[in-house]
Amino acid sequence: MTRQTLGWGVAMVLATALIGLAEPKGPTVTVKGEAVDMWCYMEGGDHGPAHKTCATMCARAGNPIGIVDAKGDIYLTAGLQDHQPARDLLLSKMSEEVTVTGTLVTKGGTKMLFVKSVK
């Protein structure tokens, strides 16, 4: 085995270990609620079917997406894979009731749901 091959092997093992460390730590939960664009919801409380077009445009533009449950609790969403936003999973469901399963992490009063699946 050459030195270069050994170096690449060690690098791959370290990279794999670091990816494992990047997984969010928390319980797996299922949340039912409405998919909202956080800008409009936080600024003016806008949500529901009448807000679907605006919510979709805002989310497409890059605004964060959240889930608001029946109690009014807000879950900010993020993608679980490759540190991507959850936009691809939720964009077509803006202003609709969804069931989201993922890893819940709470820090400083903020609830972040790392999304695994959306129904």
Predicted regions and their residues:
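Positively charged n-region of N-terminal signal peptides that target proteins for export
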Residues: M1-G7
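Intrinsically disordered, low-complexity segments enriched in polar/charged small residues
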Residues: W8-G9, K116
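OB-fold and OB-like single-stranded nucleic-acid-recognition modules
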Residues: G20-K119
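Bacterial N-terminal signal peptides
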Residues: G9-G20
